[in-house]
From Swiss-Prot:
Gene3D superfamilies: Pancreatic trypsin inhibitor Kunitz domain. Keywords: Blood coagulation cascade activating toxin, Disulfide bond, Hemostasis impairing toxin, Protease inhibitor, Pyrrolidone carboxylic acid, Secreted, Serine protease inhibitor, Signal, Toxin. It is found in: Secreted. Expressed by the venom gland. One of its GO terms (molecular function) is toxin activity. It comes from Daboia russelii. PROSITE patterns: BPTI_KUNITZ_1 (PS00280), BPTI_KUNITZ_2 (PS50279). Disulfide bonds join 31-81, 40-64, 56-77. GO terms for cellular component: extracellular region. This is Kunitz-type serine protease inhibitor DrKIn-I. Pfam families: Kunitz_BPTI (PF00014). InterPro entries: Kunitz_BPTI, Kunitz_BPTI_sf, Prtase_inh_Kunz-CS, TFPI/VKTCI-like. Residues 73-79, 84-89 are annotated as: Putative heparin-binding motif. It comes from the Eukaryota.
Length: 90
């Protein structure tokens, strides 16, 4: 296969992975954890997956501690926990 064909295949696989939803069974267990601000006193805007709404939502993180349901972007939250894309991405 030519290098152009390989690049096309890689692009299609990447697109497919972005569009394929993660089922609740495949979702990492930490996606079901409540957001934790942690023990420090920072005020960092972060994203967590909310299993009740099936959305990636904003919370404020203190900067240390907390749990793994803590993402810098909605895109990373969606990729990890499988929430559908809604509204403007971060």
């Amino acid at each position: 296969m030519s290098s152009g064909g390989l690049l096309l295949l890689l692009g299609l696989l990447t697109l497919w992975a972005e569009l394929t939803p993660i089922s609740g069974q495949d979702r990492p267990k930490f996606c079901n954890l409540a957001p934790e601000s942690g023990r420090c006193r920072g005020h960092l805007r972060r994203i967590y997956y909310n299993p009740d709404s099936n959305k990636c939502e904003v919370f404020f993180y203190g900067g240390c501690g907390g749990n793994d349901n803590n993402f810098e972007t909605r895109k990373k939250c969606r990729q990890t926990c499988g929430a559908p894309r809604k509204g403007r991405p971060t």
